[in-house]
Amino acid sequence: MSSSFGKIFRVSTFGESHGGGVGVILDGCPPKLKIDIKLIQNELDRRRPGQSDITTPRNEDDKIEILSGIKEGLTLGTPIAMLVRNKDQRPGDYNNLEQVFRPSHADGTYHLKYGIQAGSGGGRASARETIGRVAAGAVAKQLLKNLCNTEILSWVKRIHDIDSDVNKEKISLNKIDSNIVRCPDEKVSAEMIDRIKDLKRQGDSCGGVIECLVRNVPSGLGMPVFDKLEADLAKALMSLPATKGFEIGSGFSGTYLKGSEHNDSFIKSDDISKLRTTSNNSGGIQGGISNGENIEMKIAFKPTATIGKEQKTVNAEGKEVLMKAKGRHDPCVLPRAVPMVDAMVALVLADHLLLNNAQCGLMKN
Protein backbone atom coordinates (compact mmCIF):
# COMPACT_ATOMS: atom_id res chain seq x y z
CA MET A 1 0.00 0.00 0.00
CA SER A 2 1.51 3.33 -1.04
CA SER A 3 1.32 6.01 1.62
CA SER A 4 3.95 8.38 0.19
CA PHE A 5 3.57 11.20 -2.32
CA GLY A 6 5.92 13.62 -4.10
CA LYS A 7 9.47 13.49 -5.46
CA ILE A 8 11.51 16.15 -3.63
CA PHE A 9 8.86 17.64 -1.34
CA ARG A 10 7.70 14.22 -0.17
CA VAL A 11 5.02 13.28 2.34
CA SER A 12 4.31 9.95 4.02
CA THR A 13 1.10 9.68 6.04
CA PHE A 14 0.32 7.12 8.73
CA GLY A 15 -2.41 6.15 11.17
CA GLU A 16 -6.02 4.97 11.12
CA SER A 17 -9.40 6.42 11.98
CA HIS A 18 -9.79 4.53 15.27
CA GLY A 19 -6.14 3.93 16.12
CA GLY A 20 -3.94 5.95 18.45
CA GLY A 21 -3.47 8.84 16.06
CA VAL A 22 -2.70 10.01 12.53
CA GLY A 23 0.18 12.00 11.16
CA VAL A 24 2.74 12.72 8.50
CA ILE A 25 6.45 12.84 7.83
CA LEU A 26 7.40 15.61 5.42
CA ASP A 27 10.81 15.22 3.82
CA GLY A 28 12.64 17.60 1.48
CA CYS A 29 11.41 20.90 2.87
CA PRO A 30 14.11 23.59 2.45
CA PRO A 31 15.81 24.88 5.61
CA LYS A 32 15.25 28.29 7.22
CA LEU A 33 11.68 28.56 5.96
CA LYS A 34 9.49 30.55 8.35
CA ILE A 35 6.60 28.42 9.54
CA ASP A 36 3.67 29.68 11.59
CA ILE A 37 2.32 26.71 13.57
CA LYS A 38 -0.97 28.57 14.03
CA LEU A 39 -1.55 28.47 10.27
CA ILE A 40 -1.08 24.69 10.31
CA GLN A 41 -3.62 24.45 13.14
CA ASN A 42 -6.02 26.75 11.27
CA GLU A 43 -6.05 24.39 8.29
CA LEU A 44 -6.67 21.40 10.56
CA ASP A 45 -9.51 23.27 12.26
CA ARG A 46 -11.13 23.82 8.86
CA ARG A 47 -10.90 20.04 8.26
CA ARG A 48 -11.86 19.02 11.81
CA PRO A 49 -14.94 16.84 12.44
CA GLY A 50 -17.76 18.16 14.60
CA GLN A 51 -17.32 21.76 13.44
CA SER A 52 -21.00 22.21 12.50
CA ASP A 53 -24.32 20.40 12.32
CA ILE A 54 -23.77 19.47 8.66
CA THR A 55 -20.63 17.45 9.44
CA THR A 56 -19.96 14.26 11.39
CA PRO A 57 -20.67 14.65 15.14
CA ARG A 58 -17.36 12.98 16.01
CA ASN A 59 -15.71 15.43 18.42
CA GLU A 60 -11.95 15.75 17.91
CA ASP A 61 -9.84 18.82 18.69
CA ASP A 62 -7.16 17.71 16.19
CA LYS A 63 -4.35 19.58 17.94
CA ILE A 64 -1.11 19.34 16.01
CA GLU A 65 2.09 18.13 17.64
CA ILE A 66 5.38 19.01 15.92
CA LEU A 67 7.78 16.19 16.74
CA SER A 68 10.77 17.24 14.64
CA GLY A 69 12.05 19.40 11.79
CA ILE A 70 10.94 22.83 13.04
CA LYS A 71 12.70 24.89 15.70
CA GLU A 72 11.66 28.35 16.85
CA GLY A 73 9.51 28.85 13.78
CA LEU A 74 12.14 27.82 11.22
CA THR A 75 12.48 24.59 9.27
CA LEU A 76 15.73 22.71 9.80
CA GLY A 77 15.89 20.99 6.42
CA THR A 78 15.39 17.65 8.17
CA PRO A 79 12.19 15.55 8.12
CA ILE A 80 9.22 17.33 9.67
CA ALA A 81 7.15 14.90 11.74
CA MET A 82 3.64 15.95 12.78
CA LEU A 83 1.08 14.01 14.82
CA VAL A 84 -2.58 14.38 15.78
CA ARG A 85 -3.84 12.00 18.45
CA ASN A 86 -7.30 10.41 18.18
CA LYS A 87 -9.41 11.11 21.26
CA ASP A 88 -13.01 10.30 20.34
CA GLN A 89 -12.70 6.83 18.84
CA ARG A 90 -15.72 4.54 19.07
CA PRO A 91 -14.70 1.30 17.35
CA GLY A 92 -17.73 -0.38 18.89
CA ASP A 93 -19.92 1.53 16.41
CA TYR A 94 -18.51 -0.74 13.73
CA ASN A 95 -18.96 -4.15 15.37
CA ASN A 96 -21.86 -4.91 13.04
CA LEU A 97 -19.73 -3.95 10.01
CA GLU A 98 -16.57 -5.96 10.72
CA GLN A 99 -17.44 -8.67 8.21
CA VAL A 100 -19.93 -6.72 6.09
CA PHE A 101 -19.00 -4.77 2.98
CA ARG A 102 -20.55 -1.31 2.84
CA PRO A 103 -21.88 -0.49 -0.65
CA SER A 104 -19.54 1.81 -2.63
CA HIS A 105 -17.03 1.80 0.27
CA ALA A 106 -13.45 0.52 0.26
CA ASP A 107 -14.30 -2.35 2.64
CA GLY A 108 -14.94 -4.81 -0.17
CA THR A 109 -11.98 -3.94 -2.38
CA TYR A 110 -9.55 -3.84 0.57
CA HIS A 111 -10.71 -7.34 1.52
CA LEU A 112 -10.38 -8.57 -2.07
CA LYS A 113 -6.82 -7.24 -2.28
CA TYR A 114 -5.41 -7.92 1.20
CA GLY A 115 -7.77 -10.51 2.68
CA ILE A 116 -7.98 -8.39 5.83
CA GLN A 117 -8.99 -4.85 6.71
CA ALA A 118 -9.42 -2.48 9.64
CA GLY A 119 -13.16 -2.70 10.03
CA SER A 120 -13.62 0.22 12.42
CA GLY A 121 -13.95 3.55 10.65
CA GLY A 122 -12.57 2.30 7.37
CA GLY A 123 -8.94 2.35 8.55
CA ARG A 124 -6.72 3.97 5.91
CA ALA A 125 -9.77 4.54 3.69
CA SER A 126 -11.17 6.96 6.27
CA ALA A 127 -11.07 10.70 5.61
CA ARG A 128 -9.19 10.93 8.90
CA GLU A 129 -6.07 9.87 6.96
CA THR A 130 -6.15 13.31 5.30
CA ILE A 131 -5.06 15.02 8.53
CA GLY A 132 -1.44 14.34 7.60
CA ARG A 133 -1.98 15.71 4.11
CA VAL A 134 -3.60 18.89 5.41
CA ALA A 135 -0.79 19.47 7.93
CA ALA A 136 1.90 18.98 5.27
CA GLY A 137 -0.12 21.04 2.82
CA ALA A 138 -0.20 23.91 5.31
CA VAL A 139 3.62 23.90 5.29
CA ALA A 140 3.58 23.81 1.48
CA LYS A 141 1.16 26.75 1.36
CA GLN A 142 3.51 28.81 3.52
CA LEU A 143 6.48 27.88 1.31
CA LEU A 144 4.59 28.96 -1.82
CA LYS A 145 3.34 32.16 -0.19
CA ASN A 146 6.77 33.13 1.15
CA LEU A 147 8.68 32.39 -2.06
CA CYS A 148 6.16 33.20 -4.81
CA ASN A 149 3.19 34.94 -3.16
CA THR A 150 1.08 32.06 -4.47
CA GLU A 151 -2.48 31.86 -3.12
CA ILE A 152 -4.66 28.73 -3.23
CA LEU A 153 -8.41 29.14 -2.78
CA SER A 154 -10.95 26.32 -2.92
CA TRP A 155 -14.68 26.50 -2.29
CA VAL A 156 -17.85 24.46 -2.65
CA LYS A 157 -19.30 25.16 -6.09
CA ARG A 158 -22.16 22.67 -6.09
CA ILE A 159 -24.01 20.53 -3.55
CA HIS A 160 -26.25 17.83 -5.03
CA ASP A 161 -28.18 19.75 -7.74
CA ILE A 162 -27.70 23.20 -6.17
CA ASP A 163 -25.11 25.17 -8.15
CA SER A 164 -23.44 28.48 -7.29
CA ASP A 165 -22.23 31.47 -9.27
CA VAL A 166 -19.00 32.93 -7.88
CA ASN A 167 -17.02 35.95 -9.09
CA LYS A 168 -13.50 34.50 -9.12
CA GLU A 169 -11.88 37.93 -9.24
CA LYS A 170 -13.42 38.83 -5.88
CA ILE A 171 -13.11 35.45 -4.15
CA SER A 172 -11.29 35.46 -0.80
CA LEU A 173 -10.70 33.13 2.13
CA ASN A 174 -12.97 35.24 4.34
CA LYS A 175 -15.83 34.90 1.87
CA ILE A 176 -15.28 31.15 1.56
CA ASP A 177 -15.32 30.63 5.33
CA SER A 178 -18.23 33.01 5.91
CA ASN A 179 -20.64 30.06 6.22
CA ILE A 180 -20.43 26.42 7.31
CA VAL A 181 -20.83 24.96 3.82
CA ARG A 182 -17.87 27.01 2.47
CA CYS A 183 -19.73 28.38 -0.53
CA PRO A 184 -19.11 32.13 -1.05
CA ASP A 185 -22.36 32.55 -3.00
CA GLU A 186 -24.64 33.96 -0.30
CA LYS A 187 -27.78 33.36 -2.36
CA VAL A 188 -27.42 29.59 -2.52
CA SER A 189 -25.28 28.70 0.52
CA ALA A 190 -28.31 28.66 2.82
CA GLU A 191 -30.14 26.40 0.36
CA MET A 192 -27.13 24.06 0.29
CA ILE A 193 -27.06 23.88 4.09
CA ASP A 194 -30.79 23.09 4.24
CA ARG A 195 -30.37 20.34 1.65
CA ILE A 196 -27.57 18.67 3.62
CA LYS A 197 -29.57 18.89 6.86
CA ASP A 198 -32.62 17.39 5.18
CA LEU A 199 -30.63 14.45 3.79
CA LYS A 200 -28.98 13.96 7.18
CA ARG A 201 -32.41 13.65 8.82
CA GLN A 202 -33.32 11.04 6.21
CA GLY A 203 -30.15 9.05 6.94
CA ASP A 204 -28.92 9.82 3.43
CA SER A 205 -26.03 11.77 1.87
CA CYS A 206 -25.03 13.83 -1.16
CA GLY A 207 -21.98 14.82 -3.17
CA GLY A 208 -21.00 17.83 -5.23
CA VAL A 209 -18.18 19.82 -6.80
CA ILE A 210 -15.32 21.83 -5.30
CA GLU A 211 -13.69 24.53 -7.41
CA CYS A 212 -10.06 25.58 -6.90
CA LEU A 213 -8.28 28.75 -8.03
CA VAL A 214 -4.52 29.29 -7.73
CA ARG A 215 -3.20 32.84 -8.12
CA ASN A 216 0.37 34.01 -8.73
CA VAL A 217 1.58 30.71 -10.13
CA PRO A 218 5.22 30.78 -11.29
CA SER A 219 5.60 29.93 -14.96
CA GLY A 220 7.64 26.87 -15.89
CA LEU A 221 6.29 24.39 -13.32
CA GLY A 222 5.74 20.90 -14.68
CA MET A 223 7.53 18.76 -17.25
CA PRO A 224 6.58 17.28 -20.63
CA VAL A 225 5.10 13.83 -21.20
CA PHE A 226 4.79 11.81 -17.95
CA ASP A 227 5.26 14.55 -15.32
CA LYS A 228 2.86 17.14 -16.66
CA LEU A 229 1.66 19.52 -13.97
CA GLU A 230 -2.02 18.82 -14.61
CA ALA A 231 -1.35 15.07 -14.53
CA ASP A 232 0.22 15.34 -11.08
CA LEU A 233 -2.59 17.62 -9.88
CA ALA A 234 -5.14 15.11 -11.14
CA LYS A 235 -3.42 12.23 -9.38
CA ALA A 236 -3.13 14.20 -6.13
CA LEU A 237 -6.74 15.31 -6.08
CA MET A 238 -8.14 11.97 -7.23
CA SER A 239 -6.27 10.32 -4.34
CA LEU A 240 -8.57 12.10 -1.87
CA PRO A 241 -11.41 10.02 -0.42
CA ALA A 242 -14.72 10.15 -2.37
CA THR A 243 -13.32 11.90 -5.46
CA LYS A 244 -14.79 10.78 -8.78
CA GLY A 245 -13.86 13.48 -11.29
CA PHE A 246 -11.22 16.08 -12.17
CA GLU A 247 -11.43 18.97 -14.61
CA ILE A 248 -8.94 21.74 -15.45
CA GLY A 249 -9.57 24.91 -17.42
CA SER A 250 -12.45 24.53 -19.87
CA GLY A 251 -12.48 20.79 -19.13
CA PHE A 252 -15.29 18.83 -20.73
CA SER A 253 -17.18 21.98 -21.75
CA GLY A 254 -14.22 22.86 -23.98
CA THR A 255 -15.14 19.96 -26.24
CA TYR A 256 -18.12 21.99 -27.45
CA LEU A 257 -15.86 24.80 -28.74
CA LYS A 258 -13.96 25.20 -32.00
CA GLY A 259 -10.21 25.72 -31.94
CA SER A 260 -10.67 29.36 -32.93
CA GLU A 261 -12.92 29.80 -29.90
CA HIS A 262 -10.88 27.79 -27.43
CA ASN A 263 -7.31 28.97 -28.13
CA ASP A 264 -5.77 31.30 -25.52
CA SER A 265 -4.04 34.06 -27.52
CA PHE A 266 -0.80 35.46 -26.13
CA ILE A 267 -0.47 39.15 -25.31
CA LYS A 268 2.63 41.13 -26.31
CA SER A 269 5.00 41.56 -23.39
CA ASP A 270 8.41 43.18 -22.85
CA ASP A 271 9.27 40.37 -20.44
CA ILE A 272 8.83 36.91 -21.98
CA SER A 273 8.90 35.37 -18.49
CA LYS A 274 5.67 37.26 -17.71
CA LEU A 275 3.74 36.15 -20.79
CA ARG A 276 -0.03 36.50 -20.49
CA THR A 277 -3.05 35.29 -22.47
CA THR A 278 -6.35 36.93 -23.44
CA SER A 279 -8.37 33.98 -22.09
CA ASN A 280 -7.67 31.02 -19.83
CA ASN A 281 -9.36 27.97 -21.31
CA SER A 282 -6.10 26.10 -20.66
CA GLY A 283 -6.56 26.61 -16.93
CA GLY A 284 -3.05 28.02 -16.50
CA ILE A 285 -1.22 24.99 -17.92
CA GLN A 286 -0.11 24.33 -21.51
CA GLY A 287 1.94 21.35 -22.62
CA GLY A 288 2.04 20.20 -19.01
CA ILE A 289 3.84 23.40 -17.92
CA SER A 290 2.38 26.38 -16.04
CA ASN A 291 2.17 29.56 -18.14
CA GLY A 292 1.79 32.05 -15.29
CA GLU A 293 -1.99 32.39 -15.54
CA ASN A 294 -4.29 31.29 -12.74
CA ILE A 295 -4.72 27.54 -12.41
CA GLU A 296 -8.43 26.69 -12.37
CA MET A 297 -9.79 23.25 -11.48
CA LYS A 298 -12.97 21.45 -10.47
CA ILE A 299 -13.12 18.22 -8.44
CA ALA A 300 -16.20 15.99 -8.15
CA PHE A 301 -16.99 14.21 -4.87
CA LYS A 302 -19.48 11.35 -4.66
CA PRO A 303 -22.17 11.09 -1.95
CA THR A 304 -20.85 9.69 1.34
CA ALA A 305 -20.98 5.90 1.06
CA THR A 306 -21.79 5.15 4.71
CA ILE A 307 -25.41 6.15 5.32
CA GLY A 308 -28.14 5.51 7.88
CA LYS A 309 -30.53 3.84 5.46
CA GLU A 310 -30.91 0.07 5.29
CA GLN A 311 -29.05 -1.36 2.30
CA LYS A 312 -28.52 -4.77 0.72
CA THR A 313 -24.96 -6.08 0.63
CA VAL A 314 -22.91 -9.23 1.30
CA ASN A 315 -20.58 -10.29 4.09
CA ALA A 316 -17.08 -11.77 3.94
CA GLU A 317 -18.62 -15.21 3.40
CA GLY A 318 -20.50 -13.99 0.32
CA LYS A 319 -23.92 -14.23 1.96
CA GLU A 320 -26.54 -11.55 1.31
CA VAL A 321 -27.33 -9.39 4.34
CA LEU A 322 -29.10 -6.17 5.23
CA MET A 323 -27.04 -3.46 6.89
CA LYS A 324 -27.59 -0.03 8.40
CA ALA A 325 -24.62 2.08 9.46
CA LYS A 326 -24.44 3.18 13.10
CA GLY A 327 -21.17 5.17 13.08
CA ARG A 328 -20.76 8.95 12.90
CA HIS A 329 -20.40 10.12 9.32
CA ASP A 330 -20.60 13.27 7.21
CA PRO A 331 -23.87 13.60 5.29
CA CYS A 332 -21.76 15.53 2.77
CA VAL A 333 -17.96 15.55 2.68
CA LEU A 334 -17.51 18.76 0.70
CA PRO A 335 -17.39 21.43 3.46
CA ARG A 336 -14.52 19.56 5.15
CA ALA A 337 -12.90 18.57 1.84
CA VAL A 338 -12.13 22.19 0.92
CA PRO A 339 -8.87 22.32 2.97
CA MET A 340 -8.00 18.85 1.68
CA VAL A 341 -8.11 20.15 -1.90
CA ASP A 342 -6.02 23.17 -0.90
CA ALA A 343 -3.45 20.87 0.68
CA MET A 344 -3.02 18.50 -2.25
CA VAL A 345 -2.68 21.37 -4.72
CA ALA A 346 -0.09 23.03 -2.47
CA LEU A 347 1.91 19.81 -2.14
CA VAL A 348 2.06 19.34 -5.92
CA LEU A 349 3.04 22.95 -6.60
CA ALA A 350 5.70 22.98 -3.87
CA ASP A 351 7.18 19.76 -5.24
CA HIS A 352 7.26 21.10 -8.80
CA LEU A 353 8.73 24.41 -7.64
CA LEU A 354 11.67 22.58 -6.10
CA LEU A 355 11.96 20.25 -9.11
CA ASN A 356 12.01 23.20 -11.50
CA ASN A 357 14.69 24.95 -9.47
CA ALA A 358 16.76 21.75 -9.36
CA GLN A 359 16.64 21.27 -13.12
CA CYS A 360 16.53 24.82 -14.49
CA GLY A 361 17.54 27.13 -11.65
CA LEU A 362 21.26 27.22 -12.49
CA MET A 363 20.57 28.03 -16.15
CA LYS A 364 18.49 31.15 -15.51
CA ASN A 365 20.06 34.61 -15.54
From Swiss-Prot:
Catalytic activity, as annotated: 5-O-(1-carboxyvinyl)-3-phosphoshikimate = chorismate + phosphate
Gene Ontology biological-process entries: amino acid biosynthetic process; aromatic amino acid family biosynthetic process; chorismate biosynthetic process
Binding site for FMN: 124-126, 287, 302-306, 328
Keywords from the UniProt entry: Amino-acid biosynthesis, Aromatic amino acid biosynthesis, FAD, Flavoprotein, FMN, Lyase, NADP
CC cofactor note: Reduced FMN (FMNH(2)).
Cofactors named for this entry: FMNH2
Annotated Gene Ontology cellular component terms: cytosol
SUPFAM superfamilies, per database record: Chorismate synthase, AroC
Annotated InterPro entries: Chorismate_synth, Chorismate_synth_AroC_sf, Chorismate_synthase_CS
Residues noted as binding NADP(+) in the record, renumbered to the chain: 47
Alphabetical list of PROSITE patterns matching this protein: CHORISMATE_SYNTHASE_1, CHORISMATE_SYNTHASE_2
GO molecular function: chorismate synthase activity; FMN binding
Pathway this chain belongs to: Metabolic intermediate biosynthesis; chorismate biosynthesis; chorismate from D-erythrose 4-phosphate and phosphoenolpyruvate: step 7/7
EC numbers for this chain: 4.2.3.5
Subunit structure: Homotetramer.
Function: This reaction introduces a second double bond into the aromatic ring system.
Recorded family membership: Belongs to the chorismate synthase family.
Full protein name: Chorismate synthase
Native species: Prochlorococcus marinus (strain MIT 9312)
